[in-house]
């Protein structure tokens, strides 16, 4: 395995930016990056099943995608093959419950998850979502999301 120094990364970024004809990032400037390969989007009905009647989501911090946020709420994802605890729930609430995992996470849980754009549940896998107040059998909800 090769490890890159901060200077190596700066040099690589500068070379790519120069090749693509873009402007360079001034030295010392930070470029925000968010990566969340394991999270859940819930419907209002599923949020109530998991967290109790009348319970919505409690915003914790805004995400870089406008209108979206990380909530205080956390869930557990369970299959016959394994489980992940403390999984982030993102808001706002949606029309369909969606679970986004990395392909590695999906494989670890024994889920066949298609690589789809967020919101496209075509061929999506199944998982059980466990909250402090209830359980949701989320059929056709698991995808490995394309970068978005």
What is each of the regions a protein language model found here?
Residues 1-29:
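Protein-protein interaction and targeting regions used for scaffolding, dimerization, and localization
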Residues 32, 36-148:
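Conserved mixed alpha/beta catalytic, RNA-binding, or beta-rich assembly cores of soluble enzyme
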């Amino acid at each position: 395995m090769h490890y890159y120094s901060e200077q190596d990364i700066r040099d690589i970024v500068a070379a790519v930016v120069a090749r693509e004809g873009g402007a360079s990032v001034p030295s010392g400037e930070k470029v925000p990056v968010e990566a969340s390969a394991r999270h859940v989007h819930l419907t209002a009905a599923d949020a109530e099943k998991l967290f109790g009647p009348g319970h919505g989501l409690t915003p914790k911090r805004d995400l870089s995608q406008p209108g979206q946020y990380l909530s205080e709420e956390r869930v557990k994802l369970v299959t016959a093959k394994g489980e992940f605890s403390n999984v982030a729930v993102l808001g706002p609430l949606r029309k369909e419950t969606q679970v986004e995992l990395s392909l590695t996470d999906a494989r670890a849980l024994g889920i066949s998850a298609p690589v789809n754009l967020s919101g496209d549940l075509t061929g999506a896998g199944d998982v059980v979502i466990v909250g402090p107040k209830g359980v949701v059998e989320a059929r056709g909800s698991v995808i490995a999301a394309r970068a978005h």
